[in-house]
């Protein structure tokens, strides 16, 4: 790929349309100050081809649009694969403004569009035409020369890291990362499946399913047996039910026995009810005496507590009053502290002013000026104007240099115009002369042709005979001269060719003169306006300089020194000191407020304690009530000959007493009734035998049989469901085992690939292979561009150079001079470019310099090497700041920046 023509507009610093013709450039320098737009020209090429740049990538491309412009456009004409293409890319601040076109130049001179499909399709088509993707293109065509110098002098590990970065070996790391992620995923999948098999399907097997089936069949057999047993028990129960009437006597006898066994308990209950009736009148006296005692004890405790609380409240009030007096003693200090805080506020403001002004507390000056805000702003504005003036003068000098170069080229073109005008006159005169010679030769040829035609009839003339043409008698046969028509015809052809060459030369010269004259006329006006603008800018700069008096920067330092002195007088940290004063004021006021609040609380507690304390006479009333209740209780207990505890134990509620008495009466009546009924049944049944125990046993057996049958049927259903679930789990288990086996195979595959792609194995092997190929290519290239003096090789892990002009001496690259280092790094750069390009032929290289100022000998070596590169058919562009190097190159592209935007001027020679 070789660039032929670049047109850009609205692209970063290039606001206006800029045309750059690379067609006849072989070796050139791209020169300009920092920020002028040199890199933007390279970015424009990558943007045109790929829609992205090395600095921005594929995002944030609106930053490429010149400020104030709505769109940018870049058109790059280039040659690839023996054909000429043109890619045009437009980008706007709106999505609708974005467009890309690809055209191919046909042999008939017409452009054929190749822009069908989406923008993605067009981008892929462009990449196919160029033969390189974006990353490879930037590494192959735009070589970072400085990194190759670091590659030469780096340690082996550093060289491999840098080489991996230059060759894009990071993709191997991405592959390894992807493989590691796959290992992690398949390992997790395999472990999860194995865990499921071990936990949820541990007991799932064909044997377990067969065992459940056998258990279900046995349970079905048991259920059938229990069904037969239940029918037999039902028959027995029916026979026993026929004699159910005989059980009435046994039931009556049983009930009588139960009632007789309860007789002692009923008697004791009746006795307890009788005692409770005796003590019923004493129980209220017991309760009254207890309540009087409790009230007397509580009154005694409350009086003691109130007295203690009153003493405590009095002591607390005294302490609170003393604390308030102590806090109020600090209150007179507040005005003094507030005055100090106000003074520190002004010092804090001075510190803030000093910080905003860009000064420091340590600033000093031998002759400080008293601080004045207006004077400082005036001095700062003057200093800014002075800095702006310095920048403007620097830009103006650059503009003058660019104009000078442009005028030199203009003068050269003007001289060329004069020389070619004179040449045109000479070509015209030569053409007219050749035309006259052609006319003479053509006339001679015509005459010779006529002569030859007549001579062809001479053989038919005989003396005394009539002429075959005029029929007159021939008296004498004339003699004819032999003429070589072929020679004359050859002379005419040569003269015709000469006239045609003169005519074509004349037409070409006249077209060139016309085109150059148009350019001269246009540039004459343009350079005149340029010169006038420079003069006006010079006048403006002088006018601005005239209004700036003294030394504004020194005035700024003097004012800041005065302000810094004021800040230092206030202490190292006036803001902290002021905060300390304010905090102390707040602390004094807070202590006073807290003491007042504490005194108020203590006085409230004292008033409450005084109100709580009751007269001691109330304690005497409670004591009299207690003694009276105790005397009444003693008399009542003495009449019953009981103690208070015995009376309380014998006491029952009225409802319980009534219940016990009623229970005794009912028991006596029921026993009498049962005895009469039993005697009557004995008379009715006589001696007939009846066994109720057998009937109960049959009934129990039948109930148990029903329960067992139901349980057996439920168990059979559960076993059938369990068998079905086991069969389903067996199917799922087989599927999971298949998945686990597949996950294991995938894990083994990705684990092997991951181990192979690790940095310490595969990538180092790849880098070693790349390094070996690079050194081979770079060594051959270094041999060519150094006129057969140097070769580059690897010795014990270090780069060395073999000096063939010095008996093959081997030297470490660290001992090379600046020029020699440049040759070696240049060889590495171009070797890497060829390696990355593969089988794609690169017709252009752009190198950044990667070196500083060169001595004359090194400069000569570099210039010779670059000249050798040009002879290899490459277009080589050097992005450099070294003026001495750029002047040695055949052509220079001078990039300059002005208010109207950047522009490029080509200087040849």
Curated annotation (Swiss-Prot):
Q: Report if keyword Cell inner membrane is assigned.
A: no
Sorted alphabetically, the Gene Ontology BP terms of this entry are: DNA recombination; DNA repair; DNA replication; double-strand break repair
Name of a matching Pfam family: AAA_23
Q: Which InterPro entries match?
A: P-loop_NTPase, Rad50/SbcC_AAA
**Which segments does the entry list as coiled coil?**
204-250, 285-453, 484-549, 576-614, 652-751
Write out the residues that bind ATP.
Answer: 32-39
Gene Ontology annotations for the cellular component aspect, listed alphabetically? DNA repair complex
From the Swiss-Prot or TrEMBL record, what is one GO molecular function term?
Answer: DNA exonuclease activity
What UniProt keywords apply to this chain's record, in alphabetical order?
ATP-binding, Coiled coil, DNA recombination, DNA replication, Endonuclease, Exonuclease, Hydrolase, Nuclease, Nucleotide-binding
Family listed: Belongs to the SMC family. SbcC subfamily.
- State the oligomer form and interacting partners: Heterodimer of SbcC and SbcD.
| Task of the protein | SbcCD cleaves DNA hairpin structures. These structures can inhibit DNA replication and are intermediates in certain DNA recombination reactions. The complex acts as a 3'->5' double strand exonuclease that can open hairpins. It also has a 5' single-strand endonuclease activity.
Task: Report what the protein is called.
Answer: Nuclease SbcCD subunit C
Originating organism: Deinococcus radiodurans (strain ATCC 13939 / DSM 20539 / JCM 16871 / CCUG 27074 / LMG 4051 / NBRC 15346 / NCIMB 9279 / VKM B-1422 / R1)
Q: What is the lineage of its organism?
A: Bacteria, Thermotogati, Deinococcota, Deinococci, Deinococcales
